[in-house]
Amino acid sequence: MSLTLAAHGAYALSFIIDILGAGGAKPPEIAVAMSSACARHRCRSMTAVPSGSAFWRFSLGFYRQGGVAEACIRLQDQDGVDVNLLLFLLWQAVGGRVLSERDIEELERRIAPWRNATVIPLRTVRRALKPAPGLVPAPAAELFRIKIKATELEAERLQQEAMDELARSSPYGRKVSSIEEAARGNLACYAMVCQTSFPEPEIAILLAALGSPEPKLEE
């Protein structure tokens, strides 16, 4: 899901090389080359990361399962969910832990300053660049957007690493025997904290993904 900051320069350079590899291509062909390069580099960005925390590794595998990304984004945009907190609650459910509303409110209080200062502003800029405003040539604007996205994902990785440390230093919630019970309990409590109810189709997608084997992470 992310690039390390040290990898950003190499990532951007290899992206440029991919585009320049189109040689003397005309504008429409350059657009096709850019689209292909974006797809390739999105896949690389999902794996070109250090192994990180157990939570981060869970997130990498879980988020790539079918329908999960779309469900998370819908919950984010429609219900005000912090996707990293949502993933944290599902990761805790895998360990059989059910968090209370107070636990989730405490987590929200701890992570909100970082999220509001970094993740949300970067997301706003990234989304504003698709499609990019005029003035700057489209290839340059798209490369800039990709660099913003890499930085946004790095901000999310740092948030997750901090959340993992919080969970290890002071475990949250109570233990139950069923992953589904824990997941449903955590989602229900988070919905109450958000003062909403999560749509059942999104819940079903997330629960189904929890019951699927985690995709093998590339070394």
Predicted regions and their residues:
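Low-acidity, Ser/Thr- and Arg-rich intrinsically disordered low-complexity segments
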Residues: S2, S14, S35-S36
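Extreme N-terminal basic, low-complexity initiation segments
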Residues: M1-Y11
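N-terminal interaction modules that seed assembly of large macromolecular complexes
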Residues: A69-A112
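Short, hydrophobic/amphipathic alpha-helical patches that form generic packing surfaces
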Residues: S14, N84-V94, A150, D164-E165, ...
